[in-house]
Amino acid sequence: MGGLFLILYETSVELLYIFSTAFLYPDIVALLLLFAWSLALLGSLINEYTSRHRALSELEEISLQAADLRREGRAKEAAEALSSYRCPQQLSLALEQIGRSLETELFDLKFEKILQDLELSMARALEPLRIGVKAGPILGLMGTLIPMGPALIGLSQGDIKSLADNLVIAFATTVIGLVVGGICYAVLVIRGRWYRQDLSDLEYVVELLRGRKDEAA
């Protein structure tokens, strides 16, 4: 009976070893793809930073102008005025939607929907970054632990070359995983701040439009 349990134990250990080591190459490939993606993210962040335009006084002036045009019954021109403000694409699309809603009597309700949709769109854009923050270090840890088994076997057999090769893989995957997580976290924080600022500006635009509408009433 004891021999049977021993055989089952040895078989289970061998299967665990085979399954765990089988994940090494997919893990390395996934890490390299994530690393390339994170570098592309960093480049897109720099490009977005150089192209972002925010002029609060200009936005305020355009919003007040649009409010005056709407009060005069020139809703189409008011929408064109809002669309003329140069800003990030998501905010620009939201301003266009707000401009179109000026032509209806459901402006307040439409604004709430536009704002909610914009918040969801921004959250959706940040989701891959949140995944990258977690996935990078997790894959890095997997890439560290998986080669440790073969490394210990090599050490027990006096195979220094096998030990060294596996340790190199272990340390390299750790570093790459942490770099991926760090880049994703930095991009997440910076873009999150930009998106919150865009939402704040959008709310300010609508408050200006509402204020002029209330004055007219």
Feature locations, PLM:
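Hydrophobic alpha-helical transmembrane segments of small proteolipidic membrane proteins, enriched
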Residues: 1-84, 116-198
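Short, charged cytosolic
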Residues: 2-5, 96-116
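Short runs of predominantly hydrophobic/aromatic residues within well-ordered alpha helices
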Residues: 32, 36, 88-91, 108-111
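Amphipathic alpha-helices that form helix-helix packing interfaces
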Residues: 62, 66, 91-94, 98, ...
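Acidic, Ser/Thr-rich low-complexity segments on the non-lumenal side of membrane proteins
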Residues: 69-103, 217
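Generic alpha-helical secondary structure signal
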Residues: 89, 105, 109, 158-161, ...
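Cytosol/matrix-facing juxtamembrane amphipathic
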Residues: 194-217
